[in-house]
Amino acid sequence: MFSSPLLLTTALCATGVLSHSPNSYHFDPLRHLAGVAPPFDPIDPPLDPAPPQGCNVTRAAYLVRHAAIFANDFDYETYIEPFTDKLKNTTVDWTKVPVLSFLATWQDPITDAEQEMLTRSGKLQATKLGVDIAQRYQSLRTPKKIWTSTAERTVKSAKSLTHGLADDESDISVVQIQEGEEDGANSLTPYKSCPAYSSSAGSDQSSEFLEVYTKPALGRFNAAAPAFNFTATDIYGMSLICGYETVIRGSSPFCNLELLTPNEWLGFEYANDIQYHYNTGIRIEKLNE
């Protein structure tokens, strides 16, 4: 058998793009956005990926997520779109609300058609990951196949990966695996392989904390712009936009620390922790008992 990296793709994430000096720490909301945070290496300096002295890599397998998308459909339809629709219909003069004055000219970076689609930066992430893998395992043969689920964002991530992995991407076949109930190949999307899984698990617990951590921000915003009637889900949607817009446009005015405090960003992060703790973490068994 020859040595070759086996690449299993449900979605791709790239190596870190955010960093800070340990001697000049500055709170960065982009590091506290849970699943919508742009990729970064949490360890400074990053760990050396080389094997221990005296060891050699003879085979490598990668199971990775898709690269950056415009927006998760649930996030967009539940939080972002209701907030942006509310913005379109409001009569508030944002130029008279200092911390929110950018809303007078701000435009939504996401459309309905772009939901779940791969962004340009996402394609770059996937390509860079391919380059990183090729350079890291130069002694291994380039794989002939990459397996992917059939979601468009995943297929495009896999194809972008081949651009960086091989000198000629046509040397690698991107194989789409059907995941229907009759096909049985559902390991690339774990929740489809577990009949007991519930996508709503954790929502109640997370929503309860959402009402708690957003209270200070609601007090400030509704005092500044009472006609808009900010809600807890508006605050959550603004935090989501910070991450998604940064990936799409390179930056976002919603990431401003004058808009939300570090504690409020940490509240957003913890609300997501609660959601996933009960949804796919160790507490899932307790909910199913």
Task: Walk through the language-model features, giving the residues of each.
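Signature for phosphate-centric chemistry
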Residues: 20-142, 152-289
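Short glycine-rich or small-residue beta-strand-to-loop segments that form or flank ligand, phosphate
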Residues: 145-149
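Fungal secretory targeting signals
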Residues: 1-21
